[in-house]
Amino acid sequence: MLNEGKVLPVDISSEMKKCYIDYAMSVIVSRALPDVRDGLKPVHRRILYSMHELGLTPEKGYRKCARIVGDVLGKYHPHGDSSVYGALVRLAQDFNLRYTVVDGHGNFGSVDGDSAAAMRYTEAKMNKIALEMVRDIGKNTVDFIPNFDGEEKEPVVLPSRFPNLLVNGSAGIAVGMATNIPPHNLGEVIDGITMLIDNPEATILELMAQIKGPDFPTAGIIMGKSGIRAAYETGRGKITVRAKSEIEVEDNGKQKIIITEIPYQVNKARLVESIADLVKDKRIVGISDLRDESDRDGMRIVIEIKKDANSNIILNQLYKHTRLQDTFGINMLALVDNRPEVLNLKQILQHYIKFQEQVIRRRTEFDLEKASARAHILEGLKIALDHIDEVISLIRGSKTAQEAKLGLMDKFGLSEKQAQAILDLKLQRLTGLEREKIEDEYNELMKTIAELKSILADENKILAIIRDELNEIKAKYGDERKTAIERAENDIDIEDLIQEENVVITLTHAGYIKRINADTYTSQKRGGRGIQAMTTKEDDFVENIFITSTHNNILFFTNKGRMYKLKAYQIPEAGRAAKGTNVVNLLQLDPNEKIQAVISIKEFDEESFLVMCTKKGIIKKTVVGMYKNIRKSGLIAINLNDDDELVSVRITKGDDDIIIVTNKGLAIRFNEVDVRPLGRNALGVKGITLKEDDFVVGMEVPNQESDVLVVSENGFGKRTHVGEYKCQHRGGKGLITYKVSDKTGKLVGVRMVEDGDELMLINNLGIAIRINVSDISTTSRNAMGVTLMRNNGDEKVLALAKINKDDSEQLEDSEEVSEVHDAEENNSEE
């Protein structure tokens, strides 16, 4: 009072700090963050309590929203009417709340971002589940405080008989902090609470067996559980939510992508607009039409696809470039005793259980107090009825009611309340039937009092009541999960946008590489002339050719024993007759380094092995997983002697047989058990003993049903059943597999084949031919074979690859390998 009316100098820095802290705490505690107990912010709590006070229960009629907003403003929330109405609208939107607590009548907005109609037009009342939020509020279950002007009382928190914080979630931005809690399935959350009540030591992982993850009102698909687990364990995490889609195929073969569910809080109209913009800007091609066919029966966005486009590729592009796939950042921040805390899943459930214990205890105490008060009155009535004549005489002899009351209290030892109840007793209660009712009521009350006292004395009974009442709510309001949870995928990258299909990859002697669709080459009869596979320079020719899938890892092994990796789709696609791209633009090769072997694999595992064979007959086996981390600059796959180079690479299972074939027609078969696994940089061991001037042209891994097919440089070939090659010990000289002559020329390659397979041959002029293996007769090891490809003049067969066109599944899972030696070097060694 001494400083009233005076101007006091203060330090502006200190005053700003104080005022800002006061403002920040006001926003945090009184506006932006939900209470962990009822999951509500103050404005939502005041709206529900005001509607409860107005009697807007589900069985009653709707009331104008302007009336509700006015009541909230006038009694509890002296802020802007638009903010209160906006909060009321959100409580009624079934695309915002998993379980709406307000039943809105009129235009309350839409998932397209349409605003609600003005509050003077809309009406509302409480939803049935909202009654569970305020149930027992009149039984002193929660504390009340004065409102802003001290003329009313408002609850500090609602009893919230279901865990609203998790069930409906919450979002808000305070000062220096924000909360974003996703909604969940009511039944799952109640099951989680039940588990925690029964087993307080339950881990978060065990709780996740009941609470699978967020359950959004707009459904959608959550991709993976890692983000969910992180959020549940730490209170923070990020999940990926994807739209639900399906591809419809019409009778004419035309395809449509149908979107029926979108990620939570995504504006549908803006989503459709963003797709249209991508098509307009030609960032996505292949979409012929786009329309929104959503109606009162549900959401339906139709994306029509052009006939020559792939629906799956377009869908993945849409996931990448639009909010058909969105992220939801979880930050489970809530007020605990008016202090903001980041809570994990178990802590939220524990706080709710603790709060419900208080609610049940206070309700029980209220019921006990009320029952005890009634029992006290009944005890007085019983005394009066037992002495009815004396009571009547005393009352009749009293001059005033007060005198009668005091007389009853004095004569029968009654309390003031008991005496007043006797005076208020109607004469009809003096009948025998009424006296019996009073006796029965008293006996029932004594049982109730005993039960209430036993509840207060036993915490387990309180927990049992919480569990039973929650299960009743689950049975009444529970529903099926809307949001599906699917296996996690890696972040969408270019691979998701590439159609998986079989392709032919060719690599020339000069290092030109390209990718071509496998169906470009049509099958021809044995001995045909072939078609032009590619255009090569006069001094260049195709050296490597193999079949693979666009999504496979392509491992390139060089003559120096180094290896590199590319995805098949990273190899540029070109026309059949095009030259291709020089491999030095894709791989960091040394000047004297050239690709000598190529292998295609889907993934790097620890159960499979890479078996490598060199020109000098050295063999090495290494676990595939050891080559997982391949640098862009490559790494050493095998150490070589100065006069040796790498020839072949195959994938094995650890107990396969191996066949090595030489240029002069010799072959050896042995089991890879004879070759112990070695490290990446090891040299290897002897696989075959070579004659002078002989060298290895290929290595294969046979099975019992396959045939060994060898091809000579002059276009001759032969099939021999693998059974004719008996197993020997590693390091032997081998057996004759092909009698080479000037007519046939020496061998250039070997493949394991079966009926149904196809063979592709290519010569040094780039001419290719595709042959059915069944057209090649099976002969003995010593036979000369048949003509597979007619060559003119100096033409020489250089490369071969096996193709299994009819079995696409096998192609996708296969690990096809193709390799060819430097033809000029091979010829010089002959």
Swiss-Prot record:
It catalyses: ATP-dependent breakage, passage and rejoining of double-stranded DNA. Its EC number is 5.6.2.2. Pfam families: DNA_gyraseA_C, DNA_topoisoIV. Keywords: ATP-binding, Cytoplasm, DNA-binding, Isomerase, Nucleotide-binding, Topoisomerase. One of its GO terms (cellular component) is DNA topoisomerase type II (double strand cut, ATP-hydrolyzing) complex. It is an enzyme of class 5 (isomerase). HAMAP family: GyrA (MF_01897). Heterotetramer, composed of two GyrA and two GyrB chains. In the heterotetramer, GyrA contains the active site tyrosine that forms a transient covalent intermediate with DNA, while GyrB binds cofactors and catalyzes ATP hydrolysis. This is DNA gyrase subunit A. It comes from Clostridium acetobutylicum (strain ATCC 824 / DSM 792 / JCM 1419 / IAM 19013 / LMG 5710 / NBRC 13948 / NRRL B-527 / VKM B-1787 / 2291 / W).
